[in-house]
């Protein structure tokens, strides 16, 4: 799949009425109750997926933008916003077990909560908040359900296009900005040129930072920021230059992208099952094509519980611990849940067979 594929959308909003939560659903009341919890960590996003009739990203994006009054502040027409959201959601691959529009809705909702953290109160401008939410919405659009490494190893069209560098992340960005050019989909039509340029730069910086190969350097920079942390009189973080501001936003979206293990255990377990199925499907392709099977992708040799503990210990916990330091004490509950979930998976590791 490349950008060349026609980026079309069906306009479901030719009527005058804009649906209350951005999606046509017979479950409006119950959906509304759940979306009322959009600023709570651990909302049941799977239920939102069901109640929104398979359009969780549209519902979450519309609710987040409207509740923050971003449509009025940035002069985004509601119908344009919905036309874009529906089109964006259609360009997520429904057949991917994990990297589909439900994951995008989840990351957007998590980003929305993190932006509300007291340590960041009134730190970011409406344009910056919009950029972060937009980046979360688009960050995996048209994901093929395969890793960067697979795309590079198989000399895919996309790897050729992007010279093996952040292949997927470059593609997600290109598709997202291309979709804005569709008729009636340019949500930034009323921004000044300078604002558009700033927003575009921020979104690119944030989405490229979701490439896991950038994780260690992103975390190193975050640790440095924690060590030199400056706080304004009101107790909120003092971020007085673009480099510091975008660095916090990049890490915020990265945290949201790696937030599954910090959610209530029943949600986390569902996400793990979906991600493993996507990995296994890649492993099946690798086996068929005579390629080496990627780590964690062999369904006949998987150590799911052990993999999760390792993922938490080496990647997720160091990131969230550092984020929690930055916004102390705002993220303590999130960190506690992460540690409980780690202990659960540790306890579920099957005992090794005795040596022969």
Task: Identify the meaning behind each predicted range.
Residues 131-135:
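Active-site alpha-helix of zinc metalloproteases
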Residues 76, 99, 103, 124-125, ...:
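Short, contiguous, pocket-lining structural segments
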Residues 2-59, 64-70, 113-126, 137-356:
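Divalent metal-dependent phosphate-bond-processing catalytic cores, especially two-metal-ion Mg2+/Mn2+ enzymes
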Residues 69-96, 116:
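Internal amphipathic alpha-helical repeat/solenoid segments
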Residues 51, 56, 74, 97-102:
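N-terminal charged/capping segments associated with class I S-adenosyl-L-methionine
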Residues 85, 99-110:
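Hydrophobic alpha-helical transmembrane segments corresponding to the first two to three helices
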């Amino acid at each position: 799949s490349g950008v060349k594929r026609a980026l079309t959308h069906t306009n479901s909003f030719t009527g005058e009425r804009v649906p209350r939560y951005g999606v046509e659903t017979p479950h409006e009341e119950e959906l509304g109750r759940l979306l009322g919890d959009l600023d709570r960590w651990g909302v049941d996003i799977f239920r939102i997926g069901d109640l929104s009739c398979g359009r969780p990203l549209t519902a979450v994006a519309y609710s987040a933008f409207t509740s923050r009054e971003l449509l009025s502040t940035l002069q985004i027409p509601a119908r344009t916003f919905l036309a874009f959201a529906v089109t964006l959601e259609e360009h997520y691959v429904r057949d991917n077990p994990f990297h589909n529009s439900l994951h995008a809705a989840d990351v957007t909702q998590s980003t929305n909560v993190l932006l509300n953290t007291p340590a960041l109160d009134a730190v970011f401008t409406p344009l910056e908040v919009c950029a972060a939410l937009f980046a979360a919405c688009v960050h995996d659009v048209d994901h093929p359900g395969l890793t960067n490494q697979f795309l590079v190893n198989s000399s895919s069209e996309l790897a050729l296009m992007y010279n093996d560098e952040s292949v997927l992340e470059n593609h997600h960005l290109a598709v997202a900005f291309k979709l804005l050019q569709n008729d009636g989909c340019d949500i930034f039509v009323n921004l000044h040129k300078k604002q558009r340029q700033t927003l575009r730069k921020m979104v690119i910086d944030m989405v490229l930072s979701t490439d896991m190969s950038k994780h260690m350097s992103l975390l190193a920079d975050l640790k440095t920021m924690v060590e030199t942390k400056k706080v304004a009189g009101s107790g909120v973080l003092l971020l007085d230059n673009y480099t510091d501001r975008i660095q916090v936003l990049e890490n915020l979206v990265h945290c949201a992208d790696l937030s599954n293990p910090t959610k209530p255990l029943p949600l986390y377990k569902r996400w793990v099952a979906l991600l493993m199925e996507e990995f296994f499907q890649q492993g099946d392709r690798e086996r068929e094509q005579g390629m080496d099977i990627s780590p964690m992708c062999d369904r006949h040799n998987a150590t799911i519980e052990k993999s999760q503990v390792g993922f938490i210990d080496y990647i997720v916990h160091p990131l969230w611990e550092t984020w929690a330091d930055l916004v102390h004490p705002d993220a303590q509950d999130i960190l506690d849940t992460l540690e409980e979930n780690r202990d659960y998976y540790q306890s579920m590791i099957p005992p090794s067979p005795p040596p022969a």
